[in-house]
């Protein structure tokens, strides 16, 4: 997700927050999700190391890339909330 799209999502969230349609995101919520994402990334890396099929390895690498993207977004959000 590009920076522009991410900024739009933050603006949308802020508008929903002001209108009472969304609850405030707490750093503890983000930290909880971040822990889960890091565990998932570690598990995927371990599975990639043991898989011999090239197709499955490629699919797992795609999942790992998505997990890493989500981790970087969660870290950004945590910095913004601090």
Locations of regions flagged by a protein language model:
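Short, charged, amphipathic alpha-helical segments
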Residues: 31-35, 56-66
């Amino acid at each position: 997700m590009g920076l522009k799209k991410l900024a739009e999502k933050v603006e949308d969230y802020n508008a929903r927050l002001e209108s009472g349609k969304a609850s405030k995101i707490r750093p503890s919520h983000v930290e909880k999700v971040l822990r889960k994402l890091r565990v998932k990334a570690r598990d995927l890396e371990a599975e990639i190391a043991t898989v011999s099929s090239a197709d499955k390895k490629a699919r797992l690498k795609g999942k790992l890339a998505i997990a890493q993207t989500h981790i970087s977004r969660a870290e950004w959000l945590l910095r913004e909330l601090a």
